[in-house]
């Protein structure tokens, strides 16, 4: 969740991403960890990987892996997908014109409208969102009126 802490726009919001808070999150990270271990033991990589450093071969069970992951997991500080786009005001934040449901004159134009995080840096897709938003706003108000 995101919580606005102040009316001052310079005060950062509280962002609680709820990492690993659902069973599907846990299962996906465990599956990914197992896949990485399997790849590391494949003939091409086994030639150059002497041993697993972290979490180490002594960490094997799902509970042990999750304990390690919960203790060491971090973020790359590219929060996205916090303002779902859709037509339903009760479950979505913005419509397809980037307007916030229920608030006149407010649009969200940033990475928070992404449906999922991109596999690379968020800068270029965020610029594309901005460009699309500019087109939407110009179209809505008429280019000559802006």
Task: Please give the residue ranges for each predicted region.
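FAD-dependent oxidoreductase catalytic-site/capping-region signature
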Residues: 1-125, 133-146
């Amino acid at each position: 969740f995101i919580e606005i802490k102040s009316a001052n726009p310079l005060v950062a919001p509280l962002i609680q991403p709820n990492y690993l808070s659902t069973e599907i999150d846990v299962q996906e990270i465990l599956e990914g960890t197992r896949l990485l271990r399997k790849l590391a033991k494949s003939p091409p990589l086994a030639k150059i990987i002497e041993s697993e450093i972290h979490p180490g071969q002594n960490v094997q069970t799902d509970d042990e892996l999750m304990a390690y992951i919960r203790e060491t997991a971090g973020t790359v500080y590219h929060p996205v997908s916090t303002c779902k786009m859709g037509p339903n005001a009760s479950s979505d934040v913005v419509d397809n014109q980037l307007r916030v449901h229920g608030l006149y004159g407010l649009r969200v134009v940033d990475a928070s409208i992404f449906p999922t995080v991109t596999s690379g840096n968020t800068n270029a897709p965020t610029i594309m969102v901005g460009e699309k938003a500019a087109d939407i706003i110009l179209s809505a108000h008429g280019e000559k009126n802006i």
